[in-house]
Amino acid sequence: MKTFPVSIVTPDGPVYEKEVEMVSVKAESGEMGILPGHIPTVAPLKISAVRLKNGGHTDYVAVSGGFIEVRPDKVTVLSSSAEEANHIDIHRANESKRRAEQRMQDKQAHVDFRRAEMALQRAVNRLNVSDMK
């Protein structure tokens, strides 16, 4: 099957750069599956896993939102943070989840609930993706 290059990039640099047969992402508008020769598209992404298939192998990368840019010859995912499943520190992700849950339970006026909710979503996503490796 044909392949195409995929780059997942954060402000700290590239996280994933490989040739794949298919990319699956959760865009704000729903699931997207991208194959070689896909029409050009730009879409915002949800906090989720990016699935990258090549042959019988699938790689998983946790992204904290961002954008996907699809060109006929290349796909680029831009995200503020991204981690491959096998690089996720499970202890750190569990700690982040615990802290976010604690902040959401605090009844103090200074707690930014939306920010705590986003932190919780990111931590849960990282834990879910780490289980996919």
Curated annotation (Swiss-Prot):
Produces ATP from ADP in the presence of a proton gradient across the membrane. One of its GO terms (molecular function) is proton-transporting ATP synthase activity, rotational mechanism. It comes from the Bacteria. Transmembrane segments: none annotated. It is a peripheral membrane protein. It is found in: Cell membrane. One of its GO terms (cellular component) is plasma membrane. Belongs to the ATPase epsilon chain family. F-type ATPases have 2 components, CF(1) - the catalytic core - and CF(0) - the membrane proton channel. CF(1) has five subunits: alpha(3), beta(3), gamma(1), delta(1), epsilon(1). CF(0) has three main subunits: a, b and c. This is ATP synthase epsilon chain. NCBIfam families: ATP_synt_epsi (TIGR01216), PRK00571.1-3 (NF001846), PRK13446.1 (NF009980). InterPro entries: ATP_F1_dsu/esu_C_sf, ATP_synth_F1_dsu/esu, ATP_synth_F1_dsu/esu_N, ATP_synth_F1_esu_C, ATPsynth_dsu/esu_N. Its main location: membrane. Keywords: ATP synthesis, Cell membrane, CF(1), Hydrogen ion transport, Ion transport, Membrane, Transport. PANTHER family: ATP SYNTHASE DELTA/EPSILON CHAIN (PTHR13822), ATP SYNTHASE EPSILON CHAIN, CHLOROPLASTIC (PTHR13822:SF10). Pfam families: ATP-synt_DE (PF00401), ATP-synt_DE_N (PF02823). It comes from Bacillus mycoides (strain KBAB4) (Bacillus weihenstephanensis).
